[in-house]
Each structure stands twice: as C-alpha cells, then as structure tokens.
C-alpha cells in the first residue's frame, strides 16, 4: 500500500506545484558490467526516502525544486527506529549533525544540499542516517546519465557513454549509451595496443610510412616490368606458332598439288 501512496504523492506534488516536466516512464538502460550516475539532477526529480531495516521514513520523498537561477532539494529525508526500545519519538538526523562521528566517504564527495554548480540543477543529495543502501530516483525528461564500466572491466570503445531521457512520439524513452564492457583479462596487451594507437603524430611515428613508401614503389615497378616481359614472351610465342602453322599449311598445299598433278599424268 505504501508504494501506491508514494506514487500518488509524487504525482500530486508535480500537479500542485505546477511542474510541466514529465517523469520518465521507463527505467534507465541496464548495461552488463556497467554502472551509471547523474552528475546533476534536473528540477522535478524525486528521490525516495528509503530507510534500512528496523527504521521507517518520516517523509516519503525529496524533490529538486527551483527556477532557472537556483535549485535545491526540499523535504529532507529522516528515518525513525521502529524497535520497542527506541519508540520515544527519537528521530535520527543527518550524520554531519551528530558530534563525534566521522563523515562517510559519500559525504566527503557530496557538496552541501544548497550548493549547486549548474544553474537550474540539483547536486547529489547528502546521505541521511540509516539510509537504504540503494537510492531510487524518479527522473524527468531531459535527464542525462553517465555510464562507466565496473572495476575489472574496460570499455571496448573510448568516448562518452551517455543516456538521455527524451520524449519520442509522445512517449518517454532513454537513449541507448554506446558502451560495451569486456573483462580486462581477455585483453592483456590492450594498454600497449592503445598506447601505440594513441601515439601523437610526429617524426618518429611518421618515419615508418616514409620508409615503406620507397619499397612499395619498387614493388610496383617490378610488377610492371614483369608484366611487360610476360606480354613480350607471349607475343613472341604467338608469332612463332603462327609461322609454324604457315609452314605446315604450305607443306600441305604443296603435297596436295603434287598428288593432283601425279593423278593427271597417270590418266594421260
């Protein structure tokens, strides 16, 4: 029942707030041995406030709100314990608000909630205490996701691998990122091959092409000479054969003429 209420709340929020952005209906593409992340989130993006086992959420979701000049996350996520010992209304706060605790690695990489680098976009929201290990976002049209291969895998082709949620023929769809991840163990010499491929053009790299151009010219010359000699020998053989056939024809005609004269002399 709770997921239905959550979706109803998200749709109500979008309708009441006057957002004209559309939520992406489908999930982002799932590539084998690859993960994706969003560097920034467009206004209208919704994040579920999911808690780990033994805790329940007080607010259902966070949403990225703002305008073209400023955007930030609203409705901070908080989790409350459901165990009998802690049912005194104690609510856990953000890790950075608790004294004596070191910030997690994710916190150190995440800027404050109101700090935004790109205008009209929200940054990754900071973690909250007893947060679920997996975050569920509801993206809007125009959101860009960046894909990269997992550890131990390498991309078959270099270049940016992005997926963008677009509206195509009235339906929201994610573009397919051009990324294929292959195990690094299958290509042990991939780094050397890539290094030779990515070598900048210069005197050292261009010299092999200069040295190979001369032998290629000699090869073409030798081939042409060979073809000419072959044509010459063929023509010579044809001429000799024609002369032989001509001599044979003369001998045959002479023999036939001699036989006719001999027959005539006998009849007389």
Swiss-Prot record:
Residue intervals on the Extracellular side: 22-237
Signal peptide: 1-21
Protein name, as recorded: Interleukin-2 receptor subunit alpha
Glycosylation sites: 67
InterPro entries cross-referenced by the UniProt entry: IL-2_rcpt_alpha, Sushi/SCR/CCP_sf, Sushi_SCR_CCP_dom
One cellular component term from this protein's GO annotations in UniProt: membrane
Role, per record: Receptor for interleukin-2. The receptor is involved in the regulation of immune tolerance by controlling regulatory T cells (TREGs) activity. TREGs suppress the activation and expansion of autoreactive T-cells.
Organism field: Canis lupus familiaris (Dog)
Gene Ontology annotations of biological process type: immune system process; inflammatory response
Ranges annotated as biased composition (Polar residues): 204-213
Record key words, sorted: Disulfide bond, Glycoprotein, Immunity, Membrane, Receptor, Repeat, Signal, Sushi, Transmembrane, Transmembrane helix
Primary location: membrane
Localisation: Membrane
A Pfam family: Sushi
Membrane-spanning parts: 238-258
Top-rank taxon, per record: Eukaryota
Start and end residues of each Sushi domain: 22-81, 120-183
Region (Disordered): 83-112, 186-213
Basic and acidic residues bias spans: 85-102
Disulfide bridges in this chain: 24-64, 49-77, 51-79, 122-165, 149-181
């Amino acid at each position: 029942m709770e997921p239905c209420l959550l979706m109803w709340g998200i749709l109500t929020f979008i309708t009441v707030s006057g957002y004209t952005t559309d939520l992406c209906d489908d999930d982002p593409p799932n590539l084998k041995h690859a993960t994706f992340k969003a560097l920034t989130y467009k206004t209208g993006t919704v994040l579920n406030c999911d808690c780990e086992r033994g805790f329940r959420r007080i607010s259902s979701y966070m949403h990225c709100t703002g305008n073209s000049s400023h955007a930030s996350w609203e409705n901070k996520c908080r989790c409350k314990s459901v165990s009998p010992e802690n049912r005194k209304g104690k609510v856990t706060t953000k890790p950075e608000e608790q004294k004596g605790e070191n910030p997690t690695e994710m916190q150190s990489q995440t800027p404050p909630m109101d700090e935004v680098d790109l205008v009209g976009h929200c940054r990754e929201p900071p973690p909250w205490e007893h947060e679920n290990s997996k975050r569920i976002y509801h993206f809007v049209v125009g959101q860009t996701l960046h894909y990269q291969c997992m550890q131990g895998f390498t991309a078959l082709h270099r270049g940016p691998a992005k997926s963008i949620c677009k509206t195509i023929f009235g339906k929201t769809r994610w573009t397919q990122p051009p990324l294929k991840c292959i195990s690094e163990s299958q290509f042990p010499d991939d780094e050397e091959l890539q290094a030779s491929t990515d070598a900048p053009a210069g005197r050292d790299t261009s010299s092999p092409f200069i040295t190979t151009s001369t032998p290629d010219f000699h090869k073409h010359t030798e081939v042409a000479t060979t073809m000419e000699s072959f044509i010459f020998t063929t023509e010579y053989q044809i001429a000799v054969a024609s002369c032989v056939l001509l001599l044979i024809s003369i001998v045959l005609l002479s023999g036939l003429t001699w036989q006719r004269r001999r027959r005539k002399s006998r009849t007389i």
